[in-house]
Amino acid sequence: WDTLALLGITRSDVVFLNDKARYKMVLVGSSLTHDGLSNTPPHTKVFDIINRLQGEYDGPEKIYVSRRTWMHDKTGNIGTNMTEARKCVNEDEVAEYFISLGFEEVFCENLSMKEKIGLFRGAKVVAGPIGGGMVNTIFSPPETKVISIDSPTFFDINTRFEYSMCHTQLHHFTDTEFAGDSTGWVEPGDVGVLSISGGLNSPWKVNMDSLKEFVSGI
């Protein structure tokens, strides 16, 4: 509802389907994450809509997008919470490094839509482990520097995340590795689906020496 309100669409403008009405035509949008189109480039009109969204937030110029949900334990606003399954096991060290560089740690799950739009529109440098929070760079202007710390094999199937960031000054850091067993599995009977546990959704860690060298060169 927050996003619709920012586009001038109120609750009274929304009509829900019901079994007492007959419709001559119904247009159903495709899933952004779970069908054959999820990893194809978005239509250009998508960005026309996104750019209409206005946010307000007096935030810092350098932000670290944290996945350390254990710091506050508020996960109700996370759609699919993979912060524990695909946990960066040395993120405490990663976060403290960026904080030492003057970055402010932010938790997107604790912000409203308007606050997130304002935060990412205003930030000049954005860094963090790849995940839902980093996708908010879709609101960032082209001149924003973005440092995406990529977990192993994540972008093998999650190209849609790239499309939310590639309009910025994007830098991928890839010197990461799985931390322990990364064997993937799915529930019995789920034929032809991606691993829902293990695999790319396994715990991982960052090579800190390599990260520091990488960041110093940007």
How does the language model describe each region?
Residues W1-I218:
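The feature primarily captures lumenal catalytic ectodomains
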